Amino acid sequence: MKKSDLVKGLKELGLKKNDIVLMHSSFRSLGDFKGSVDDVIDAFMSVLGPKGALIVPVFGSLGILPERVKARKDVFISEVPVGTLAGIGGRAKDVLSGHWEAETAHGEGSPFLKIAEAGGYICLLGVDQDRNTTLHSAEALLKLPYLGSCTRTCKAPDGKEVTRTWHYYPGPHRDFIGLDHIMRESGIMEVSRIGDAQVRLIKAKEMLELMVELGDEDPAFALCDNPACADCVRQRAAIFADRIANESFKLSVSSRLAGHYVPEMIEKLQAAGIKYVELDYVQGKACTFMDAQQLKRIVDDFKEAKITVSALRSYVVPEDTNGFVGKMKEAGIDRVILPLFDFFYGASAFAKEGIVVDFVNTHVTPSQAVQALLKVAPLKRRAFVFSPSGFVLAGKNPFLNAWRVGQFIKTIAQLDVNDRTWDGEIRSFAKGNGEIKELVSILRCHNFSGWLTLGGGSPYPGNLEAAVKDFTHLLDTI
């Protein structure tokens, strides 16, 4: 293949005079090219003309073509140490200048956006979408929660050494390759063979508009779904954590649902993006019956992993209230969930030591729950943990009956996110008679600031990953 063949191929692909093109390339992909690296660059410039611009990335070792462009006498290089671009041609300076003033390396004010706004193109010469840096611009425009920051000490355009930070900076793995068919099917990308190279020419503005639309619908649009990819698992967790942070409620998970051993629980909670755990069972043993040292070790392990214990749930009334209070204080647990019953004296013992006591309904009717709560009325705090499964097992509709009869909006501190059928069969969320969807919906209407606990007070018919998916679907359909 000769230089003239490359010129012809680029024109047939859609490039024309005065265009701006950002090229990502592999010189070797052209195969038996009868010419030099400079001949490839000259072929592009003969198509673009003196008023066009050929832009290449130079923020790392990205191949011989970018290096040769960077070495040209008439080159203009953007002034930043991250996302750096070099360009030649009449429009290169206009596109690349001002990169230093942009708050992000790839977003607003960056050359990547300027190329798109000017109607420019992205050319992938013998490389795939994995090299398409402008896709990071879509992430930056969306301000996706898994993006980080990049800080560098470098010389400013005035020659002074400064330290500055670029926000919404991309991190590790993406599944940009998986976006290729979407571009092709949408008609914003032309694909052709030039020599041995598969060449893609993409309309930059249309690509960004499409990617932002995809990202608005699904913030994980650029991530892979491989459970063995730790990078994308972590980034998906950041998306979920950000979503929950924008809710009024706080989300916790029962330790029984999180796993068997504490290290396993930590790994799964972090993978899900959940920062709170409610202690009920660890290694198959009820936390109620653990000694203070065991509890403290568990709490400390979670704390080291930046996971906070939201409460300890006891399924029985402690016989030795003072001893139970003592080990909770030693372990650093400041909230306990107890079965609802006449327990004013014991509850007072917790309150005196600064431990919050919340009561949960277990096999009681709504009216019985109200009466039991009245018996602890002398306490400053009279808070209720609403268990849909508990009311189902008591033969009452949790929302249509119990919620209204008990007027629990006045006392609720936590909603246990669980579900069952009338005959006691455990179900995934909103698949039983627990009316969990209605309960979550009404709490959101009130901007409820208390706890929602996945698997609280009842087993879940699956693992934590499945529970989070079910809960996400629940939120999506409200």
Predicted features and spans:
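Glycine-rich, proline-tolerant flexible connector loops at the mouths of alpha/beta enzymes
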Residues: 278-299
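Short, conserved active-site loops that position catalytic residues or coordinate cofactors/metal ions
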Residues: 19-28, 57-58, 272-283, 313
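Catalytic-core regions built around general acid/base machinery
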Residues: 39-48, 293-304, 345-353, 438-443
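Active-site acidic/histidine proton-transfer and metal-coordination neighborhood
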Residues: 264-267, 308-394
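Histidine-acidic metal/acid-base catalytic patches
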Residues: 246-255, 259-273, 292, 327, ...
